[in-house]
C-alpha cells in the first residue's frame, strides 16, 4: 500500500515538474552599451534541461508501470517473489540516481543562469545574469528542480521499502 502511494507521488511530482519545464519559455531584450540584444530561453536549448526532461519522462513512465504492477499485486493479494523484488530494487536504485543526477545537472545550469554572465572580463562592462532578464523561465525551472528533488526523495524511500520487503522475504521463508 505504501509502495503504491510512493509510486503515485513520483508520478505526480514528475507531472508537475514536466509541466513547469514545458511551459518555461520567455523572450526579452538585454541592453548593453546602447545596443538592444534579443534573448530567449526555452528548456530544449540547454543540455542539462533536456537531460532533466528526458529523465523525468522515463522515470514517470517507470513509476506508472510500477504503480499498475503494485496495484495488480495488491488486488490479487499476492506476494512478489524474491527475484521480482531484487529486480525492482535494482531498477528503483537506478531511477533514484538518475533523477538525482538530472536534478543536479539542471540545478548547475540554473545556477549558471543566475550568475554566469555577471561580467565579460572588462572592468566597465557588466552584463546582467540570465535570470534577471528572463525571470519567468528561471522561476519555472526552479519549480521543476524542486519537484524533481521531491521525486528523488520518494524514489529513495521506495528503495528503502524494497530493501525492507527483501529482508522480510528472507526471514519469512
From Swiss-Prot:
Q: Which domain of life is it from?
A: Eukaryota
Transmembrane residues, as ranges? 2-22, 49-69, 85-105, 141-161
Membrane-side (Cytoplasmic) residue stretches: 1, 70-84, 162-173
What spans does the record annotate as topological domain Extracellular, numbered to this chain?
23-48, 106-140
Keyword Cell membrane found: yes
Name one cellular component (GO) term.
Answer: plasma membrane
Instruction: Provide this UniProt record's keywords sorted from A to Z.
Output: Cell membrane, Glycoprotein, Membrane, Transmembrane, Transmembrane helix
Residues bearing attached sugar chains per UniProt: 44, 113
Membrane topology term reads: Multi-pass membrane protein
User: One matching Pfam family, short form?
Assistant: CASP_dom
* Subcellular localization, as worded in the UniProt entry: Cell membrane
Could you give the subunit structure recorded for this chain?
Answer: Homodimer and heterodimers.
Q: Which family does it belong to?
A: Belongs to the Casparian strip membrane proteins (CASP) family.
The protein, known as = CASP-like protein 3A1
Species this chain originates from: Pteridium aquilinum subsp. aquilinum
Amino acid at each position: 500500500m505504501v509502495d503504491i502511494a510512493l509510486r503515485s507521488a513520483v508520478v505526480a511530482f514528475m507531472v508537475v515538474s514536466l509541466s513547469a519545464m514545458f511551459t518555461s519559455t520567455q523572450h526579452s531584450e538585454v541592453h548593453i552599451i546602447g545596443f538592444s540584444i534579443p534573448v530567449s530561453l526555452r528548456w530544449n536549448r540547454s543540455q542539462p534541461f533536456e537531460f532533466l526532461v528526458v529523465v523525468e519522462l522515463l522515470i514517470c513512465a517507470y513509476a506508472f508501470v510500477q504503480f499498475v504492477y503494485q496495484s495488480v499485486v495488491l488486488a490479487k493479494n499476492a506476494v512478489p517473489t524474491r527475484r521480482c523484488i531484487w529486480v525492482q530494487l535494482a531498477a528503483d536504485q537506478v531511477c533514484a540516481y538518475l533523477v538525482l543526477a538530472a536534478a543536479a545537472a539542471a540545478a548547475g545550469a540554473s545556477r549558471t543562469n543566475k550568475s554566469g554572465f555577471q561580467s565579460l572580463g572588462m572592468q566597465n562592462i557588466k552584463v546582467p545574469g540570465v535570470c534577471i532578464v528572463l525571470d519567468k523561465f528561471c522561476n519555472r525551472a526552479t519549480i521543476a528542480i524542486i519537484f524533481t528533488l521531491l521525486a528523488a526523495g520518494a524514489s529513495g524511500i521506495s528503495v528503502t521499502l524494497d530493501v525492507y520487503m527483501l529482508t522480510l522475504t528472507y526471514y519469512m521463508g
